[in-house]
Amino acid sequence: MAKAKFERNKPHCNIGTIGHVDHGKTSLTAAITKVLAETSGGATFTAYDQIDKAPEEKARGITISTAHVEYETQNRHYAHVDCPGHADYVKNMITGAAQMDGAILVVSAADGPMPQTREHILLARQVGVPALVVFLNKCDMVDDPELLELVELEVRELLSKYDFPGDDIPIVRGSALCALENKSPELGAEAILKLMAEVDKYIPQPERPVDQPFLMPIEDVFSISGRGTVVTGRVERGIVKVGDEVEIVGIRPTVKTTVTGIEMFRKLLDQGQAGDNVGVLLRGTKREDVERGQVVCKPGSVKPHTKFKAEAYILTKEEGGRHTPFFTNYRPQFYFRTTDVTGVVTLPEGTEMVMPGDNISVDVQLIVPIAMEEKLRFAIREGGRTVGAGVVASIIE
């Protein structure tokens, strides 16, 4: 049967399932597709084993296994990611390979919160996942309502500990297995529909890139005789129009200038928008005043910084990373958007070294400022070879 084409007339949202191994993330993903396929036709049922053998993808030089399913509710169209292994989650969330606008935290009612439950909540906080909804799975295995209350309380405390609004986050009780096997509808299909209603309501609709303030990383600089300097790149977000005042940020002191022309495929345009590869002509800017690695942006929308806290994943030897651990004062290059900048890594108190395969929170001090904000992704490199990936968790200065 041919794949039905999804009508893109509903707002789009990216979500994923997170939580401890074997708590039922993949079963829940399968159950959502099954229930929506049967009730509203908003999905194609994708069985557990189809999701579980997820294809490998490369993101920022790192191989990650991720399964993607899509479905829609009355209100929204969703792209949903599910990862087979814990390491895949860590890599996925840190590289932003699958951007999450929100996530469903799956907790087994029979086991309660476990180490990876905690770790995924912390990661979600560090990489800036805006909102979580909880699915308390395997409720068919728990007869004692007081035990369910207790697990729910534990989950709320854990969420609050990592700065999520634990008291307000919706928690839906159910059983993905019941939904897949058409048993006890109140724990099965009905619980799944209730969960999706909460996801619709509680996870905020993300702002589209085109509605955000203009930013374009500079990839190349040319001078065109008699016309001035052209910077080229792919517009990351927002819209730029001829006549707009912009700032050039990063590496050097910030300068203001005006856009006097925009071209794409050798044609002149009135504006460029998120996703376009364009050349932007800048008034009165000399070729030697701008360089790859800077950004052109809406004035005041992004500032240059040198010091930040990051959440990073360090590649294993098998993934092409380092063969040995590193220590505090490690000096690799940090690849932001289009360029490498050297930086010094400070490990947290009590951490002696970082092994390949670890994920860790570190402080980084760059030797030159880069236009940055929270959630910005980067690669960690040594001589052009990727040895890790990271995300800016917070800016220090």
From Swiss-Prot:
Residue numbers spanned by region G4: 137-140
Example of a GO MF term: GTPase activity
Region (G2): 61-65
Protein localization: Cytoplasm
Chain positions recorded as Mg(2+) binding sites: T26
Region of interest (G1), residue spans: 19-26
Gene3D superfamilies per the UniProt record, alphabetical: P-loop containing nucleotide triphosphate hydrolases, Translation factors
One Pfam family cited in the UniProt record for this chain: GTP_EFTU_D2
Region (G3): 82-85
HAMAP family: EF_Tu_B
Entry function: GTP hydrolase that promotes the GTP-dependent binding of aminoacyl-tRNA to the A-site of ribosomes during protein biosynthesis.
Family: Belongs to the TRAFAC class translation factor GTPase superfamily. Classic translation factor GTPase family. EF-Tu/EF-1A subfamily.
NCBIfam families given in the database record: EF-Tu, PRK00049.1, PRK12735.1, PRK12736.1, small_GTP
Name this polypeptide is given: Elongation factor Tu
Native organism: Azorhizobium caulinodans (strain ATCC 43989 / DSM 5975 / JCM 20966 / LMG 6465 / NBRC 14845 / NCIMB 13405 / ORS 571)
Gene name of the encoded protein: tuf1
